[in-house]
């Protein structure tokens, strides 16, 4: 598998909504039971991420007996819809939530719907966070969130199919095109599965190509609304997506399958390359019967 370029929007974290709960005095926290509604995306019980998250919540509740945490877990696309609906109104049922930065987070901070954490994040806490990992959550001089995990978008490759096609695993875009065209000639094989029915994966393909064309700083500026998505590099990234489709590298109908279908085909040896997060390595490793595990 080859590492794919990291995209700015992949940095996610947890932020606190500025409700009266967080304006309460220390005496209230000490005397009364406080319920916090925590929204997240850790829904796979077999995932190490989910298990670590739930263990952290359990430990926190043991250490803070007056705080009860109500968990609200949804898959990515359902989460986006539901959390947007909440914030379109009062978001009274959201206290702590999983979100994307900097662009989408800035929409909420501009609307004054997120609590700045400057007074809560101590130097000790900062010392335990990887340097630079909070930069996307720092807007207008305020820190609004903390990173909950980190990952990269990666290009996972079935080496056996590459050998059958007589091509090497690509390290550049041009090599990706060359390999994809050769792989497309194999019977019943999709060269590159994106799972584009799930919108975030379709976006990840474009985002990765945009990073290649314009660089991380330009992407971040566009996400923050400081520049427009109209320069030639962003246009070229869109043209790259079209090229991949026109050459049959994305399969006949890349919008037909989501991540689950793409994953099944990849594990069954019907897909040569899959674009997914670095967590996908665990999916491969945990699969009982996989054509690519070894």
Residue ranges of each PLM-predicted region?
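Short, solvent-exposed loop/beta-turn-alpha elements that line the ligand-binding surface or hinge
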Residues: 116-129, 196, 213-236, 286-292
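Extracytoplasmic/periplasmic substrate-binding proteins
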Residues: 41, 104, 239-294
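Hinge/lid segment of periplasmic solute-binding proteins
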Residues: 100-153, 177, 185, 204-207, ...
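Short helix-initiation/N-cap motifs at beta->coil->alpha
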Residues: 73-82, 103, 173-177, 253-267
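Hydrophobic core
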Residues: 12-20
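Short helices/loops that flank or line small-molecule/ion binding pockets
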Residues: 80-92, 161-162, 181-185, 260-274
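Glycine-centered hinge/linker elements that transmit conformational signals in sensory
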Residues: 180-182, 223-254
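Conserved N-terminal structural module of periplasmic/extracytoplasmic solute-binding proteins
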Residues: 9, 23-106, 110-111, 123-126, ...
